[in-house]
Swiss-Prot record:
Annotated ranges, domain PPIase FKBP-type: 162-247
Gene (name only): tig
Protein name per UniProt: Trigger factor
Protein family per UniProt: Belongs to the FKBP-type PPIase family. Tig subfamily.
Pfam families xref list: FKBP_C (PF00254), Trigger_C (PF05698), Trigger_N (PF05697)
Taxonomic path: Bacteria, Pseudomonadati, Pseudomonadota, Betaproteobacteria, Nitrosomonadales
Known EC number: 5.2.1.8
EC class (word): isomerase
């Protein structure tokens, strides 16, 4: 086998390989002979079919298989000999021999991984959120839990904020009905902001059996393009008002949350512990986000291989398609412009290249016990954690997500040891993105 490598660009290479024709013919004949031992043809006993007949029947297929195997094998050997790190898949092309017909020649065009020069992290600054879960945070969570268990009871009085009302409505724009502008027995809780302010405010103070007509101006950026920027006239009839009743924070409420013996203080302690666990996860997520950005910022400019970017684009597109499907949306003709995902795909490929180099240089591969810890943490979100853990370990490919998470944790830990890390006091609501 003879090889030579051509540089076609910063990362693009062409590998030219020539293989003796005799080697291919020998392999084709060897495979045909093996096939003849088991081939069945009418009029011949098994294993007694002449090689010429086997070659006539199976020759083209066997030759094709041999050529493919030779291409792959010799390409792999040539890549090793030339110390090439192939990114993506090569494009194979046969070459017409100019003079020496004793050689089979082909070329493989591909991209290689770029050289990664990691920057100095000593001057990098990272802020670690410092969060204390307060009694007020526990109270806010309790209030959310109470609202999730709210009960409504009919009342004979004008509607006010917090009430659930039942209405029939009909909207007209320029005297004509429009999509979504009509409903019967429609329920909503006043003050939750589900509908436009111009629609909800006139409903306050209405009594059961009362009707009202008013105008609603749709914003120019309203999601319904048919009505965006237009004014509609709504006729509304209110058929019922229900007052909200929140459960008291007592033993019965604690029991409804699964707290043994309805211990209210134990309930508050468990809520606090859950908030602290969630806060710790959010802190780690913010640290990881900063670390990844620091790695991008401190590493010299990287020209990501186009093949890897295309593969990442396909992954992002598939993720988006699955997300749409999980929401019950039709994905038959689903497609997103590549321009929407191009920048994100390039960012992810660059980051992946940096992480790969960092892990290789500093041996940051996760240990089995680290992967196990990630799996067990993921499993806690399910009803039967033990079954979820067993499911992950039943097939190696199911562990890839956990392995990636553990690897990233190792990278974050390593970078935090090198960078300048300062604490930043932060309310829980801000950390959770609620402020």
């Amino acid at each position: 086998m003879q090889t030579n490598v051509e540089n076609l660009g910063a990362l693009e290479r062409r590998l030219n390989v020539s293989v003796p024709q005799e080697k291919i013919e020998t392999e084709v004949e060897s495979r045909l002979k093996r096939l003849a031992r088991t081939a069945k043809f009418h009029g011949f006993r098994p294993g007694k079919v002449p090689l010429k007949i086997v070659a006539q029947q199976y020759g083209p297929q066997v030759r094709q298989e041999v050529m493919e195997d030779v291409l792959k094998k010799n390409f792999s050997e040539a890549v090793r000999e030339n110390n090439l790190r192939v990114a993506g898949y090569p494009r194979f092309e046969p070459k017409l021999a100019e003079s020496d017909t004793a050689q089979v020649e082909f070329s493989a065009t591909f991209e290689v991984y770029p050289d990664i020069t990691l920057g100095d992290l000593g001057g990098a600054h990272i802020e670690r959120p410092v969060v204390e879960v307060t009694p007020a945070d526990v109270d806010k969570t309790l209030e959310v839990l109470r609202k999730q268990r709210v009960e409504f009871e009919p009342v004979d009085r004008p509607a006010q904020a917090g009430d659930r009302i039942n209405i029939d409505y009909r909207g007209l724009i320029d005297g004509a009905e429009f999509a979504g502008g009509k409903a019967e027995n429609f329920s909503l809780v006043l003050g939750e902001g589900r509908l436009l302010k111009d629609f909800e405010e006139p409903l306050l103070g209405m009594s059961p059996g009362q009707s009202k007509t008013f105008e609603v101006a749709f914003p120019s950026d309203y999601h319904g393009k048919e009505v965006a920027g237009k004014t509609a006239v709504f006729e509304v009839k209110l058929s019922g008002v229900e007052s909200s009743k929140l459960p008291e924070v007592n033993a019965d409420f604690a029991t409804s949350l699964g707290i043994a013996e309805g211990d209210v203080e134990k309930m508050r302690s468990e809520i606090r512990a859950n908030l602290e666990r969630e806060a710790a996860k959010r802190v780690n997520a913010r640290l990881k986000e900063q670390v990844m950005q620091v790695l991008i910022d401190t590493t010299s400019n990287i020209d990501p291989p186009k093949a890897l970017v295309e593969m990442e684009l396909d992954r992002l597109m598939e993720d988006a398609r699955n997300d749409f499907a999980s929401r019950g949306l039709d994905t038959k003709n689903f497609s997103l412009p590549h321009d929407m995902l191009q920048e994100r795909a390039q960012h992810r490929v660059k980051l992946g290249l940096i992480l790969g180099e960092l892990v290789k240089m500093h041996n940051l591969h996760p240990k089995p016990e680290q992967v196990r810890a990630v799996v067990e943490d993921l499993a806690q979100a399910y009803e039967n954690p033990a079954e979820v853990v067993s499911w992950h370990y039943a097939a190696p490919e199911r562990l890839r997500e956990a392995e990636s998470a553990a690897l990233e944790d190792n990278v974050v830990t390593w970078v935090l040891e090198k960078a300048v890390v300062t604490g930043k006091p932060m309310p829980l609501d801000e950390l959770m993105g609620r402020s």
